[in-house]
Amino acid sequence: MIKSFNQPDAWIKRISAYAGINEELAKRHEVVSIQQINFEGEYLQNDVSYHFLKFRLPSKYFPVTLNKDIKQQQPDIVVIQGTHFPIQVLLLRLKLGSKTRIIVHHHAERPFTGIKKMFQRLADRHIDAYLFASRQMGLSWVKKGNLASPQKIHEVMEVSSVFHQIDKVEAKGFTGIKKKLVYLWVGRLNANKDPIATVKGFLKFAQRYPDAVLYMIYHNDELLPDVYELLEEHPNGNAVKMIGQAANNELLYWYNSADFFVSGSHYEGSGTAVCEAMSCGCIPVVTNIDSFRMITNNGNCGLLYQPGNVDELCKVLLQTVEIDKAEKRRLCLEYFRDHLSFSAIARGIEEIAASL
């Protein structure tokens, strides 16, 4: 239970990157979304019926009340958010019977090992479809033996973006950015996101293009001392601006102020910030991992490099100076609309559900 939230509208706003998918589905279907915060009751917003339920700890593993509520809805389709609930899936299937279709939506989880893997394989027999941001990610679960059939794996983005493109002059008026070569980082400062390799690669690039600036927005400062140490020791350290936290609504202006979005992630379930950046026409310079290949249409909408490879990052950053930015921006916006938007994700889920 998310105890810090006790108002339904505040919580729905907090999960807007997910809620927008349900709102699109609700335009054509009856949608019930079950949530758990410090509130109990029903709440209707944008045609989505939210059921806020409270459970004690044992109910997390043996969700009798939850399954009873689900059965009362008489659903045709149940979408479970997350792949790490095999016991709960088994109990739900027992409650619902065989007619209701169960779809599981992957959210960055890794395949279980040991006895948990056994339960995952058992639950797999009772699941009709899986949604992964990248089909290749789902196939890796099949290869490891956690899931049995590649036929159940479908490629559907995990989240979308509430942001949109606005005038760059307006955006820069808010952020105060005056530079022409603007790059943006949004994410945690941890080992997986690899800000160290990112900063090293950018500083190397900035030696060639001293007018280039990387703005870093973050809400986790795990590696902040290491980043500062890098910047203090480098002669071009002022090419990286450590912004810190930014309110979610302010990100609209940051994404629209930047020309390029930079990520150093070694693993992502999807890539929320990359998706948000693309919705604003900000071109991604990201690592060559499964989820980012899907989000960038195999690099067609951006530039890819190997995680942790400082020299390769510098090389692709040098390419950003030469490419046709207007054309790349157009490709970003077009691909976002057709594959990453709320309407595109909802359409994909509808098509999969209809095929079951």
Language-model-detected regions and their locations in the chain:
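A short, active-site helix/loop in glycosyltransferases that binds the activated sugar's phosphate group
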Residues: 37, 126-152, 160-162
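Glycosyltransferase donor-sugar binding loop
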Residues: 186, 213-228, 244
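Short hydrophobic beta-strand element within catalytic cores of glycosyltransferases
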Residues: 283-286
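Nucleotide-activated donor-binding/catalytic signature segment of Leloir-type glycosyltransferases, i.e.
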Residues: 227-246
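Aromatic "clamp/platform" in nucleotide-sugar-dependent glycosyltransferases that forms part
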Residues: 266
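Conserved donor-binding/catalytic core segment of Leloir-type glycosyltransferases
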Residues: 176-193, 199-202, 215
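Short alpha-helical donor nucleotide-sugar binding micro-motif in glycosyltransferases
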Residues: 245-246, 253-258
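Conserved acidic donor-binding segment of nucleotide-sugar-dependent glycosyltransferases
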Residues: 298-299, 303-310, 318-325
